[in-house]
Structure formats: structure tokens, C-alpha cells
């Protein structure tokens, strides 16, 4: 089916998709057509933001539907690049070994997995991790559960 994707500031593209395609797959097509990186895209349908993991049928998007594209500007706050340095370094490494699109996909996956892993840490987990970092001489005992 044909969809029209319209950026809020002008550009428009027609793309060929199926109802079973995910929003992320659509974003990749939009990246090819409109040269907007997936990480900067937010797709809307009838005013509702679309989640990457859902398929188009989930939102009742059919032939001839029109999606709106909001482009998120990626501006780093002045004087604060510490957290982004590792991601930028990883991005450079990935781009040496993968196409730009694949490198972006891998980087997004790693970032999401990292955020998910952090959100699962309990206060006890953080305390054990800090103890291992600050007192490496106790790490063997901690690994064996003697300090728990």
C-alpha cells in the first residue's frame, strides 16, 4: 500500500509498505527518501505518536493514509558532552564496519538495551557494584556472596 509521509516543515514522500510492517521499518524508508536519520524521526498518525515496535495495522493505518513527520533536532547542551562521548565513539566504530543505516540501528539497540538494563538495577545491585569498583580486594568475597 502507498503512504504519504509529510514533514512538518515541507518535504513529502510517498512510500510503499504493507500493513504488517513496523513503524521502525517505515522510519528506515523515510530515512532513505527524506534523508532524516531514524533517531531524529517522530511519526504521527491522526495526532498520535507511533511506537517503533508496533506494526501499521495496530494503528489502523491503511492505503492512502498520511503520516506526519516531526524532526527532532539533536543539539547537545553546551558544556555537557560527557555522557555522549561513549555513544559517539561507538557510533564511529560501528560506521567503520557497517552501513550508516545498520550502524544507526545497532547503536539504537545498544542504547535501548543499556537504558533497560539500568532501569532494572535495584539499590542493592548498585551498592554491590560500587563496592566492587571502590574495593576490588573484596570482589572475590562479594562474588561468592560472603558480603551479602
Curated annotation (Swiss-Prot):
Disulfide bonds: none
Entry's localization field: Cytoplasm, Cytosol; Nucleus
Keyword annotations: Cytoplasm, Nucleus, Transport
Any one GO biological process: tail-anchored membrane protein insertion into ER membrane
Domain of life: Eukaryota
UniProt xrefs under SUPFAM superfamilies: Ubiquitin-like
GO cellular-component term (any): cytosol
Residues in Ubiquitin-like domain copies: 1-76
Pfam families: Tugs, ubiquitin
Chief location category: cytoplasm
PANTHER family from the UniProt entry: UBIQUITIN-LIKE PROTEIN 4A
Subunit structure, as described in the record: Component of the bag6/bat3 complex.
Role summary: As part of a cytosolic protein quality control complex, the bag6/bat3 complex, maintains misfolded and hydrophobic patches-containing proteins in a soluble state and participates in their proper delivery to the endoplasmic reticulum or alternatively can promote their sorting to the proteasome where they undergo degradation. The bag6/bat3 complex is involved in the post-translational delivery of tail-anchored/type II transmembrane proteins to the endoplasmic reticulum membrane.
Protein name: Ubiquitin-like protein 4A
The species this protein was found in: Xenopus tropicalis (Western clawed frog)
